[in-house]
Amino acid sequence: SVFAFENEQSSTIAPARLYK
């Protein structure tokens, strides 16, 4: 997924902005 580069399921939990 675009938002969850680490895990596809992470997209539903939190967007990539949180990881960055």
Swiss-Prot record:
Q: Which residues form a coiled coil?
A: none
Please give a single GO biological process term from the UniProt record: defense response
Residue segments, region Disordered: 1-20
Q: Which domain of life is it from?
A: Eukaryota
- Induction section of the entry: By heavy metal ions.
* Cell wall biogenesis/degradation listed as a keyword: no
For this UniProt record, the keywords arranged alphabetically read as follows: Pathogenesis-related protein, Plant defense
Which family is annotated?
A: Belongs to the BetVI family.
Question: What is the name listed in the Swiss-Prot or TrEMBL entry for this protein?
Answer: Protein PR-L2
Organism the protein comes from: Lupinus luteus (European yellow lupine)
Lineage of the species this protein comes from:
Eukaryota, Viridiplantae, Streptophyta, Embryophyta, Tracheophyta
